[in-house]
Amino acid sequence: MSGNVILVGFMGAGKSSVGRLLARRLGRCFVETDDMITAREGRSVPEVFAERGEAYFRALEEETVRLLALKSSDVIATGGGLFCREGRPEALKALGTVVWLAGDFDVLYERARRAGERPMLAGRGRDEVEALYRAREPFYRQADLTVDTTGIGPDQVAAQILLALREIPSPLGRGPQGEPPPEARRAHQREGRP
């Protein structure tokens, strides 16, 4: 498993805000899949949706997932639907630790509405958006870690993710920051190693 930390979740979960904070605290690069798409297309996500449609955007996301395989130790914030296609959970989990930023639907919906241009909100009523959230939930539940963002700010969410990441053993016996797990640190200290 590579050292990427991949944030998934519904719109309004705070993936961008939390991702920036987390990257800063881990000393890593921050990447947003929507930014990768807008850089390639030369236009915003809402413009891509309006001009080319959702199917075209989803094809761009598929290409973006392939490009993410080139990343090895970044913090990556995904678009809300990127994780929610057959085979995507497995593909992204192969690239790093996937963290679902969960939350109460009503809270997420209000955050997304306040944030402005959200193509998946355009022309949809609250009930339709909730149905979309419920359809995506089974995918999100496949993440390696879940952090509930309801009632806490991005700083606290990032702190919870950092704590959870330190508990995950890596195949090399090192945590996401390259630190040996606590029991290995104690053994190294007894042996006089750093």
Question: What is the role of each PLM region?
Answer:
Residues 29-93, 117, 126, 137-139:
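ATP-dependent small-molecule kinase phosphotransfer cores
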Residues 7:
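Hydrophobic anchor at the beta1->P-loop junction of P-loop NTPases
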Residues 80-82, 104-106, 152-153:
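Short glycine-rich anion-binding loops that position phosphate/pyrophosphate groups of nucleotides
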Residues 16:
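Walker A/P-loop
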Residues 94-138:
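A glycine- and Lys/Arg-enriched "phosphate-lid" helix/loop adjacent to the NTP-binding pocket
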Residues 2, 21, 25, 71, ...:
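NTP-dependent small-molecule kinase module
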Residues 10-13:
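P-loop (Walker A) phosphate-binding loop of NTP-binding proteins
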